[in-house]
Structure formats: C-alpha cells, structure tokens
C-alpha cells in the first residue's frame, strides 16, 4: 500500500522524555513491524496526568511511493500530507497549495500515471505557474455572460475540466464502426463525433430512415419491405434495426405514409430520419426537432434512446437545433464582422487568445510612461484582462521622483 496508517500510544513517561519525541516515533514504528526509513507524517497529542507524567498519542502515516499503483490506495488528504512532507522546504505556501490542487485534480480524475509523475518531479515551478494561469482563466470565464459560456461549452470538448484543455492532444479513441452494411452511411456517422461538429449543418447527399422492428415480426417485416422494392441496409452489431435508403427525389414522409400500417400496429418503430431539412422547409418544428435530436445523439453516443446521464448533451443539442429553427437555418442571427461563412460558435481561436492573455497577465510596470494613462482626459490601463475588478498595484515603498 502507498499509505500505511499507525496509531500508537506510549505509557506514561517522565517529562524529560518530551525531548526524545522523534526517537519514540521511530520506536513505535519499529515496534509495530514497519519500515522506519520511509517518509512519515506524524500527528501527536501529549497527555499529562496529575503526577506530571506525560503520555504520547501518535497518529502516523507512512508513505511507500514505490507501491503507489492505484488511486484506491489513498485519499486526497493523504496526497496533501505527502506533498506537505516532501515539499515544505522547497515551496512557498501559495505554491504548495497550487501543487496540492493539481494533484487533487489528477486524483479525482483517476489519472494515477500523471499523479505519480507530478509527485516525482523535482522542479515543479513551471507546473505551478501553469496551474496559476489555469485558475486565472477559469475566473476570467466565470465573468462571461451565459450566452458566451454556452457557446464555449458547445465548441470546446473539455471546458473547465481540470487541466484537460483544448490545446492538449485529444487521446480519445474514435467511435467504433457501428456495424451498418453501408460504407457511405458509416462515413456520414463518423463525420459527427462531437458537439462542435453538429453546428456545421451537415447536409448529406443520401437520405435514410432508421427503423426498429419487433423481434417476433423481423423476418416477415424484412421480406415485406424487400417486396416493396425498398433498399434495405442491415446492421451486423445491433439486432432488429435496419435502414431504408430513400430515392433522391423523395422525402421520408412519402415512405412513412407507406409504412403507416406497420407503425400503427407497432410492428416497426421509427428511430430517426436524416432528411430533417424537408421538415424545416415545411414548418414541422416537432418532427424536425425530434429527428435532429435522435440522429445527432446516435452519432455522438451510439444510442437510439436518450439516457438520463446524457442530460447535458441533450440540452446542448436542443439549443443548437432550436437556434437553427428560430434563426431560419442559421445558428447566428447576425453576420460575423470578419466572415460571413463562419458563425460565432465556430471561432475556436477565442479560447486560445484567452489562454495567451492569462499567461501574460502578471506584468511589472517600471515607469509612468508604461502606464500609458492620460491623467487629464482619463484612459483605461491596458492590462488585457477585460476584468472589471482587476486593479493595478502600485508599490508605495519605492521613492517617487
């Protein structure tokens, strides 16, 4: 185990034994059969009886870093104690707290590999500076309006989730092949793997209807659809679901009317259609909304039914689809100044710029000319923070000439 806990109470001893406190700790560890050479964190309590004799109550944590292989072996408090024990002489109180914060972040994420590397790292100055910038940036984002925060949440996969920012390499494995016996549809699904890709208004050349068939009617239903000359696409991984590929000159409503008898008798169930633009043009909001949500959710999560754990994804998808509807097919209700091709939600550089500002916010002003302030007309100090509560500190201890 990484952490070994020991509670030990001595017998009553003469007052002079208080000078031998460390020896008593080592003896307690040795007496209980543990390695007294390991780093240890000791909480001690001294009890004095009526005769003036003292008794020591030790609560000892011993750390064996070589055996730290699993998060379940420790707690965040243990990590804090280990950092206090090993870094107390090399870091200031502020830096110590920042290091504890980043280690706690890795502990809560279950990232034991990175946590081990951080705890082993000899020089953590650069890491502490990075954590400070992260904290500054998060405070900066807390002052965004709700609309700004929502747009960033949509366009950034890991907003405000510890240290996993967008500029770090994304190690997430791509979504596996869904099992459809149609390479074109599989490629379509692979083109939408994140919320930020949903906003690009994917319009595909082919149109599909996805149906779920009752297990007891599967063979008869497939045979009946084939007799009607429907182009059927089966799935090798998910049973009792199929795709119908539509003709280029038809829409899904034409096909659904043909399937009305099967739908009414609950032999088949509609999962989604991909030609949602048809319902947008015809003013059918509910069908446009329902099918958009179902299709995008399937692209992102490989699930046909919404699950409670994905409430945030559902909310973000609803926001995107509803904005498109109420803005006439566009996410933004205005034209972007720099380009009419992109909408504001697609500007990923906004986040990069805020990180650059965060890295440069700690600026030392050497003379009055650098302040660049007109004392007569008044002018804002250019700190680059866009943060109303931030102030410029003047060192009054230095003599002014």
From Swiss-Prot:
Major site of localization recorded for this protein: host cell
InterPro entries per record: Baculo_p47
A biological-process GO annotation: DNA-templated viral transcription
Family according to the record: Belongs to the baculoviridae p47 family.
GO cellular component, one term: host cell nucleus
Keyword Magnesium assigned: no
Subcellular location: Host nucleus
Disulfide bridge map: none
Organism listed in the record: Autographa californica nuclear polyhedrosis virus (AcMNPV)
One family name in Pfam for this protein: Baculo_p47
Keyword Nucleus part of the UniProt annotation: no
Keywords from the UniProt entry: Host nucleus, Transcription, Transcription regulation
Subunit structure: Interacts with LEF-4, LEF-8, and LEF-9.
Function in brief: Component of the viral DNA-dependent RNA polymerase which is composed of four equimolar subunits of LEF-4, LEF-8, LEF-9, and p47. Plays an essential role in late and very late gene expression.
This protein's name: DNA-directed RNA polymerase subunit p47
């Amino acid at each position: 185990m990484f952490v070994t806990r020991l509670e030990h109470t001595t017998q009553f001893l003469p007052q002079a034994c208080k000078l031998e406190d460390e020896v008593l700790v080592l003896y307690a560890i040795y007496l209980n059969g543990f390695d007294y050479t390991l780093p240890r964190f000791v909480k001690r309590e001294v009890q004095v009886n009526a005769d003036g004799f003292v008794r020591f109550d030790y609560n000892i944590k011993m750390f064996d870093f070589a055996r730290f292989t699993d998060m379940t072996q420790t707690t965040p408090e243990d990590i804090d104690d280990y950092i206090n024990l090993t870094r107390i002489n090399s870091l200031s109180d502020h830096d110590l707290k920042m290091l504890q914060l980043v280690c706690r972040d890795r502990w809560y994420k279950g990232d034991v590999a990175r946590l081990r590397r951080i705890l082993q790292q000899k020089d953590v100055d650069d890491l502490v500076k990075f954590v400070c910038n992260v904290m500054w940036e998060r405070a900066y984002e807390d002052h965004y309006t709700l609309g700004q925060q929502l747009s960033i949440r949509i366009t950034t996969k890991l907003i405000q989730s510890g240290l996993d920012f967008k500029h770090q390499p994304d190690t997430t494995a791509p979504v596996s092949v869904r099992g459809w016996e149609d390479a074109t549809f599989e490629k379509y699904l692979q083109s939408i793997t994140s919320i930020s890709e949903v906003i690009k208004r994917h319009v595909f050349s082919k149109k599909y209807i996805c149906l779920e068939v009752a297990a007891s009617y599967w063979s008869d239903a497939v045979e009946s659809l084939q007799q009607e000359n429907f182009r059927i696409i089966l799935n090798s991984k998910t049973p009792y679901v199929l795709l119908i590929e539509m003709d280029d000159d038809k829409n899904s409503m034409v096909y659904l009317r043909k399937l009305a008898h099967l739908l009414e008798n609950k032999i088949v169930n509609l999962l989604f259609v991909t030609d949602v633009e048809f319902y947008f043009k015809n003013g059918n909001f509910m069908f446009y909304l329902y099918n958009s949500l179902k299709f995008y959710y399937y692209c992102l999560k490989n699930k046909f039914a919404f699950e409670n754990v994905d409430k945030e994804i559902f909310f973000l998808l609803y926001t995107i689809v509803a904005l498109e509807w109420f803005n006439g097919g566009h996410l933004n209700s205005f034209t972007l100044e720099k380009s009419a091709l992109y909408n504001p939600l697609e500007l990923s550089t906004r986040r990069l710029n805020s990180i650059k500002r965060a890295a440069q916010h700690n600026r030392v002003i050497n003379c009055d000319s650098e302040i660049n302030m007109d004392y007569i007309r008044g002018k804002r100090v250019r700190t680059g923070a866009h943060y109303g509560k931030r102030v410029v500190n003047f060192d009054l201890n230095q003599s002014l000439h």
